Amino acid sequence: MTSNKRSIKTNSFIHFGCWNNGLCDKNEGTNSVSKVMNKLNKYARKNINFISIAGDNYYPKKIKKEKSEKKEKGEKSEKSKKSEKKEGDKIKMIHTNELVSGFNCLPNNVEINMILGNHDLETNTRNKQQLYVDDITKMEDMNNCFILNSEIKEAVNKNINFVLQKTYELSKNTLIIMIDTSMYEDDAINYIPCYNEYFQINGVIDVPITNIIELQKLQRENILHKLEELKKTYSNIIIIGHHPITGWKEKNDNNILINPSIEFIELLMDIYENHQSSKYYYLCADLHLYQQGTIKIDDKMVIEQHIVGTGGAELDTAIRVEPGKTINPDMNILTYEMKQNISTNGFLHCIENGKQICFKFIDIMNDTIIKNNCNSNSFDRYSRKSKSSKKSK
């Protein structure tokens, strides 16, 4: 007997960030990034559309610069003194072999869309000089963007697309908008040299960017122009960035709620004004944990946010907040209700079935799956048995 049920195509992708930390060996490595890559490569054999990596694609090692036993005789000029790092200060060492190993650990059988985090845009500037390359005597040249250039080099001839901003359809029901969020940071001016390096390599613009406001304006115009070009309505809009809109974190033994960027909130509201009937999801990283919650902006735009900075970086402490408690950051138009907060490594599996979106966090440390909105039987083919699996609604 032939079934009259209409089959619904299922699309899915994997999302995480904050990952390339230390030497990666996906087969025998015991550090966090190796374990995540081992699991990811096995999981990527499933029928997924692509992998979204939300930045911080390499972490230089923080080390303390040893004090020299003897100082050179003679007085140095004030200008010379100011330009040097103070002895005993912490510096950041780029280990090229570790950076390369991480990119070689990524799955090679599926498209990877990779955005930039703040660590990818780090370089020595006139005001901040702390990056060294492979040796304590080799300081990175000013405005050299060694990390970014090395990452782009590793992506060449691989299945990796570096994305500063991109808008595309997962299906007729779901739109994905990948956004650069580092330009909304307070110290984003320090990233201008590497933004221009990226633009030059990719032939994006002819004239170098000179200020961050100009860059924010360019991104906003590109996104809104693409939305106008599409002229469609979507059941779901998934926005992907590096930084959370807001979220709970621990800092100096205090529980801190991240203050949102006003400029970024304005961009989100501009997107919302074009698609008010859509369901909104925001996937990001930056905090080294898995945190899920609901954000409401101006009592209009409701966003389900997933912070997934769990790809291999040293983990942050997951603070405890009263379940269901809604908090206002220092911005009256926004509220945040945290629902999940776990300090662990893993990645998020995002599944679309028809007009529904389901999220499954694959926790590799505890060997569990944390489910969000996955109540329908239509998502069962992506499930696996786990005695300790957790479920949230």
Regions found by a protein language model. Name each.
Residues M1-E66, E84-M93, W248:
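N-terminal active-site segment of His-dependent metallophosphoesterases
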Residues M1-S7, K65-G88, E214, G354-C358, ...:
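Compositionally biased low-complexity segments enriched in polar/charged residues
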Residues H15, I53, E169-L170, E352-Q356, ...:
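Generic beta-strand structural signal
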Residues N49-I51, S235-I237, Y280:
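Conserved acidic residues
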Residues A54, L230-E250:
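Short acidic, glycine-rich surface-loop motifs adjacent to enzyme active sites
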Residues I63, K86-E228, I258-N259, E263-Y281, ...:
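Extended active-site neighborhood of metal-dependent phosphoesterases/phosphodiesterases
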